[in-house]
Amino acid sequence: MSVFESETSNFHVYNNHEIQTQPQMQTFLSEEEPVGRQNSILSLTLDEIQMKSGKSFGAMNMDEFLANLWTTVEENDNEGGGAHNDGEKPAVLPRQGSLSLPVPLCKKTVDEVWLEIQNGVQQHPPSSNSGQNSAENIRRQQTLGEITLEDFLVKAGVVQEPLKTTMRMSSSDFGYNPEFGVGLHCQNQNNYGDNRSVYSENRPFYSVLGESSSCMTGNGRSNQYLTGLDAFRIKKRIIDGPPEILMERRQRRMIKNRESAARSRARRQAYTVELELELNNLTEENTKLKEIVEENEKKRRQEIISRSKQVTKEKSGDKLRKIRRMASAGW
C-alpha cells in the first residue's frame, strides 16, 4: 500500500488498488495519532497541570487561570522541545492576549465555571440511544480534575470547538461506502487516471490558527499554514457565516443606507421648502409694513401742510386788524 502524506497536511491518500476495509482504516487512525497531539498541553488533565505548576486552580478566576496556564505551557515546551519533529505541529493553543473572555467569565473562578458546566449538562442530558451519545455522557460526567484542558476551554466558551471534517467515499468509484473518506479522482504527471481515497483526520482546528492542505500527485506536495491576517479573516468568516449570508447582509445594509440617505434628503428638502415659505411670508409682511409706513408719512405731511396754511391765514388776519383806521374825535 502506498501512502502519500504531507508533512503538515491533515489528509492521507490511499491507492485505489489496495483499499483497506473500514475496521482496518479505523485501527490505522487510532495508531496514527500525532505525537505532538499526545504531548500537547491540551491533552493534559487539570490535575496533571496542577501537579506541574504546583498551584490549585479551583479558587482562581479565569484571568489568573490563563496566566498560570501559559507558564505551564512554556515549561512543557521547554521539556519536550526536542521531541517534536519539524514536520509535526501539535494543536496550537492561542496566546492569552488573543483569547476573548466575556466580562462575567473573567470574574468567575474555575470552580464556579465548572459548576455552571455541570448544571448545563444536567439541564440538557444527552440521549442514550447510540453508543456515541453514551460515551459522550460518560465523558461529561467526569470531575474537574479528570477533564482535559481542551474540553474545559471548549465547554467554558474560551476556545471554539474544533472543526471535525467527516467526508464520505463515493460508492460509484470504489464500490463501497465506509464511514469516512471521500472519492477523489486526480491525474498524475503521466496523464494516467488514478483514483485515490482521501480521508481527513479529526485534528483540532482552532479559529486562531488557519490551516489549509492540498494534495498534488506526482513529485509535488503542497501544504500551507495560514497565520496573522489570514487567520483573522478565517475567524471572522467562521463567526459571520457563509459568503451567501454575508452578501445578503451587505445588500440589506446597502438598502438601509440608501433609505437613510433618501430620508435625510427628504428632511433637508422639507426644511428648505419651509424656510422658503417663511421667507416669502416675511417678505410680504415687510412689504405691507413699508406701505403702511408710507401712508402714515403722507398723512403726517398733509397734516403739517394744512396746519401751516391755517397758521398763515391767522397771521394775515391779525395784520389786517392792526392796520384798520382808528375812530377820530367828535369835534
Curated annotation (Swiss-Prot):
Predominantly expressed in seeds. Its main location: nucleus. One of its GO terms (cellular component) is nucleus. GO terms for molecular function: DNA-binding transcription factor activity; transcription cis-regulatory region binding. Residues 249-268 are annotated as: Basic motif. The modification Phosphothreonine is found at residue 143. It holds the Pfam family bZIP_1. It is found in: Nucleus. SUPFAM superfamilies: Leucine zipper domain. Residues 247-310 form the bZIP domain. The modification Phosphoserine is found at residues 40, 98. GO terms for biological process: abscisic acid-activated signaling pathway; positive regulation of DNA-templated transcription. This is ABSCISIC ACID-INSENSITIVE 5-like protein 1. It comes from Arabidopsis thaliana. The gene is DPBF2.
